[in-house]
């Protein structure tokens, strides 16, 4: 008895990485078969068309192989199946992970496989959605391709893997503005900011989903064949500001840093449009964030005109606060391809990649070797008084504000430019009210477990509702971390942002 592949359902984005909108795409679903001899299959470059009444589907040329190793039937609403055990690993990685040559439909798209399919005679062997080419602004349309099997043919369906081969891309074909990286990175976050053991609240947090379109050249560099029209990626902004000596500077950072950052990115956009700067991406982002922080610091100190909050055109030349007030500032820009973190002070950003924590910032402490040397070179002193302090007063070596400690305490941030990876789980931004009592690994493990536990208890939100407002699972994780910090002895204000980097999760279930 002849054996063939099982019924499968696939949602495919079928277009080149960059497509000329004037050139139509013809895509084929090729050779769904058992991968018992992968080498023979991958070397087989022939074209076939089955038209004998058994299988009727389009076959085509091959060049690039994409293997889906654990194919499952997709329900029309793409609901998330929640695992029974928190320690189980996800079967399917999130929709934000990008693969060269693949365009992924926005999770909020209404395109999906049909619930039922009518065939003239037989049963469905495979169905797939073929996306028609669109511009970024248009809603993708689709056609459903169906391969069916006649009842009168005696065949046995067996489990197998599926190899989907994409047509060879012609590098000489003109390309349009649609990019493989123009993929909606669904923002999933939760925040909390509490007084903790302090009598006054001096912290502030800010989350701005869909913050800004960033030119791909600032993320991916000058790839051959990239459109000169500078396609963009959507970024999401997150910031934690830990004030000291008062709340004025932290509050001003809350209201101003994101807009100052947007101004600097806009300036870089204009430079990229006029010419190729020749700078590396790390250098570009360092310049963007340093200029942003220095501008805000000058505004805080009354050195330059600053905008008045709530007024679009009014400017004033006056200090925001007394010169003894300052704030840390840790900021993360998250998009589908990269995470960019800037930090000034002792707040911190930590990434959970797989099961390992990765700090994306390094605390600016006076006893850090390079910071100690910089302070002494500038004529300052690091004095031990309940820990290392600049001039015996400030327990951090960099901050925004603190004019009375210039030039020993500086506002210059350090910047980390981190490409996203498939294993990325979550990102935590927090003030030292958390990090003083909890290690990076502990915080990441607690956050991940809490997110998974929330999904186990409550199920998954419909995709159309994900990314709208704060994510309840991330919110639960942030609140849980703050309670643990208090239980572990934190006496400071505690501000936390938890960002779930798995925009779409699918978990193992107990059979």
From Swiss-Prot:
Enzyme Commission no: 3.1.3.16
Free-text tissue specificity from the UniProt record: Expressed in seeds.
Annotated GO MF terms: metal ion binding; protein serine/threonine phosphatase activity
Manner of cofactor binding, per the entry note: Binds 2 magnesium or manganese ions per subunit.
Any one GO biological process: abscisic acid-activated signaling pathway
Keyword annotations from UniProtKB, A to Z: Abscisic acid signaling pathway, Hydrolase, Magnesium, Manganese, Metal-binding, Protein phosphatase, Signal
Catalytic activity reported: O-phospho-L-seryl-[protein] + H2O = L-seryl-[protein] + phosphate; O-phospho-L-threonyl-[protein] + H2O = L-threonyl-[protein] + phosphate
Cofactor: Mg(2+); Mn(2+)
Positions bound to Mn(2+) 1: 242-243
Subunit-level organization: Interacts with PYL13.
Protein family (similarity comment): Belongs to the PP2C family.
Protein name in UniProt: Protein phosphatase 2C 7
Organism: Arabidopsis thaliana
Record gene name: HAB2
